[in-house]
Amino acid sequence: ARVLEIGCGTGRNLVMAARANPQALFYGFDISSQMLMTASAKAAKAGVDERIITVAGDAEKFDARRAFQLSGFQRVLFSYSLSMVPDWQRAFLNALDQLSPDGRLHIVDFGEMERWPGFARALMLKWLARFHVQPRAGMTATVETLAKQRGLSVSARKLAGGYAVLIMVSKEPVPAVQKPPEKADNSDEINFIHAMIP
């Protein structure tokens, strides 16, 4: 299987997934060259650098298929990166273009925290803004609209009172994202990433 992470950052997800899935090949790109240096070092330290390739690229327009000379990817992942892209809808559509015919796009990102107390939500949004992160209002609805315009299937779930959202997009009917318990840790996101590998 070929797996692409868009906005791979320091390579945490790539290394974790590569160690758990020795049969798969992993690719990633990020706009930050400094983070990619860290990603390369992490992959080498974990002994999975032969199965992880990363390059610099802009999520809104980077053609990963051309860069890596591949026909497409079975899995494409955004992990808390789509909310950092200025034109996130363009980045989403670009990600769909990277999928192979049997491919699936997975998104894990910040939600609108609609069930949080007002003061807690305001503090969290202020803290996220320090890192140039802006949860996208109506992300799930917009993803569903854009995906359906291309005849794609969508399944989505919320975590921890809307703290995060898990979304899967596929050319084939996708299984429902299992409803996780309402808790604050990130184990469900990690399991979601692990489960995406075919």
Cite the ranges covered by each PLM segment:
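A short glycine-rich, Lys/Arg-flanked "PGG" loop and its adjoining helix->strand segment in the class I
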Residues: Q89-P101
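Core SAM-dependent methyltransferase catalytic element
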Residues: L152-K183, D188-I197
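A short SAM/SAH-binding and catalytic strip from SAM-dependent methyltransferases
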Residues: Q74-D87
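C-terminal alpha-helical "lid/dimerization" subdomain adjacent to the S-adenosyl-L-methionine
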Residues: V108-Y163
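Class I SAM-dependent methyltransferase SAM/SAH-binding core
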Residues: L4-I6, T10-K61
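Short glycine-centered segments of the SAM/dcSAM-binding site in methyltransferase folds
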Residues: R2, D102-R104
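Short N-terminal helix/helix-N-cap motif within the alpha/beta-hydrolase-1
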Residues: Q34, P86-R90
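A short acidic, Gly/Pro-enriched loop at the edge of an enzyme's catalytic core
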Residues: A64-V76
